[in-house]
């Protein structure tokens, strides 16, 4: 679990709960020191529970070292300070997981976008899309210095089909394109950038949906645990040939099969390609500088 006698280091943004929390804990189980960011420090601040301190403790309990850092990803100075701290305390960065997203409940209503609060769209583009660029910007020099670094964007099929309106679609499509274009800049330095499509994930919100009616029980059968993608990310980081997939949007369930990773109770979650007949966009290989 070490590399050159140094613990491997990851930063996971948006890790108070949900997918980010699961990814951070999974990386901890692989021996990573994980800096986990979020805004929630006190129990009860969010109706969905969870704090960055709780996540950090779970990372440590899983076998890694959890470091909670309160970061508002709308504040670029706080993001810059995060990576300055990682440099000072660790001297390296192996993985950045861009997961932070500010999703209002109103965004998921069936109304047309103009009948939803404007903040529901703008906030997601700020903390979700823009925040991924800013975090990658400040992480890049440290990743390049470390060598063989990995940048991950957590994404979803909403990148290529309608879901929750144009802001959500632009968010997911933008993350996938971030991975594609950052890969071009990172390639000479051996750093990999990928986007990973998640399936249905057993987050706090999804569990509430499943519990709301027996007809929704099928979701539990196909859902991924929040930790599932974290194990996929750890496998990617350990793969000596990972640069071959740099720039791609990966379907997490398919990558898991390739690496022999199963989820709870030995399950193999279905690919969204199978569930929804969707696949990531294909980008032209032309590079213009």
Residue ranges with predicted function:
Residues 2-90, 104-112:
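Short-chain dehydrogenase/reductase
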Residues 7-8, 64-65, 92-93, 143-157, ...:
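Active-site loop of short-chain dehydrogenase/reductase
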Residues 12-13, 98-101, 128, 149-156, ...:
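Structural signature of the Rossmann-like NAD(P)-dependent dehydrogenase/reductase core
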Residues 27, 92-93, 176, 186-201, ...:
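Conserved Rossmann-fold SDR core element
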Residues 94, 114-134, 152, 175:
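Catalytic Tyr-X3-Lys loop
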Residues 101, 123-147, 159, 183-184:
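Amphipathic alpha-helical dimer-interface segment in Rossmann-like NAD(P)H-dependent oxidoreductases
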Residues 102-106, 114-118, 149-188, 199-201, ...:
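Catalytic loop of short-chain dehydrogenase/reductase
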Residues 195, 212-289:
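C-terminal helical subdomain
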């Amino acid at each position: 679990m070490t590399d050159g006698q140094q613990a491997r280091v990851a930063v996971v943004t948006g890790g108070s709960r949900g997918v980010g929390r699961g990814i951070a804990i999974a990386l901890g189980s692989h021996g990573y020191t994980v800096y986990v960011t979020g805004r929630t420090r006190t129990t009860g601040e969010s109706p969905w529970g969870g704090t960055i301190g709780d996540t950090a403790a779970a990372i440590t309990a899983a076998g890694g070292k959890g470091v909670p850092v309160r970061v508002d990803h709308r504040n670029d100075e706080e993001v810059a300070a995060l990576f300055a701290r990682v440099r000072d305390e660790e001297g390296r960065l192996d993985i950045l997981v861009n997961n932070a997203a500010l999703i209002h409940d109103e965004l998921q209503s069936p109304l047309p976008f103009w009948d939803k609060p404007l903040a529901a769209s703008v906030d997601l583009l700020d903390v979700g899309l823009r925040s991924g660029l800013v975090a990658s910007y400040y992480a890049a020099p440290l990743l390049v210095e470390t060598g063989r670094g990995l940048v991950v964007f957590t994404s979803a099929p909403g990148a290529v089909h309608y879901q929750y309106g144009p802001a959500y679609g632009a968010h997911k499509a933008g993350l996938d394109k971030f991975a594609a274009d950052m890969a071009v800049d990172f390639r000479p330095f051996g750093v990999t950038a990928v986007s990973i499509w998640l399936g249905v994930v057993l987050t706090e919100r999804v569990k509430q949906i499943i519990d709301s009616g027996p007809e929704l029980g099928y979701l539990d059968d196909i859902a991924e645990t929040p930790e599932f993608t974290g194990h996929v990310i750890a496998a990617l980081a350990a793969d000596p040939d990972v640069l071959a997939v740099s720039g791609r949007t990966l379907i997490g369930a398919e990558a898991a099969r390739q690496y022999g990773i199963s989820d709870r109770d030995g399950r193999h979650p279905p690919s969204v390609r199978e569930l929804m007949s969707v696949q990531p966009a294909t980008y032209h290989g032309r590079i213009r500088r």
